[in-house]
Amino acid sequence: MARYFRRRKFCRFTAEGVQEIDYKDIAVLKNYITESGKIVPSRITGTRAKYQRQLSRAIKRARYLALLPYTDQHR
């Protein structure tokens, strides 16, 4: 019987020593939204609660300023 090995999730922001997540850093923010534009939950990404709150706030600010789209496809 084969065992499934799941890689341990870790918080990238804690490992890098990030103090504040910047809403202008679109390359980082795009890693934490789905193709449809939803924010990926921390149980999937492994992000700590402190940084997940900063991340969601930064994504929402970037959306408001039209740096990120709200959805992928506008029809």
Swiss-Prot record:
Keywords: Ribonucleoprotein, Ribosomal protein, RNA-binding, rRNA-binding. Gene3D superfamilies: Ribosomal protein S18. One of its GO terms (cellular component) is cytosolic small ribosomal subunit. It comes from the Bacteria. One of its GO terms (biological process) is translation. Coiled coil: none annotated. One of its GO terms (molecular function) is structural constituent of ribosome. Binds as a heterodimer with protein bS6 to the central domain of the 16S rRNA, where it helps stabilize the platform of the 30S subunit. Part of the 30S ribosomal subunit. Forms a tight heterodimer with protein bS6. NCBIfam families: S18. Belongs to the bacterial ribosomal protein bS18 family. This is Small ribosomal subunit protein bS18. It comes from Buchnera aphidicola subsp. Acyrthosiphon pisum (strain APS) (Acyrthosiphon pisum symbiotic bacterium). The lineage of its organism: Bacteria, Pseudomonadati, Pseudomonadota, Gammaproteobacteria, Enterobacterales.
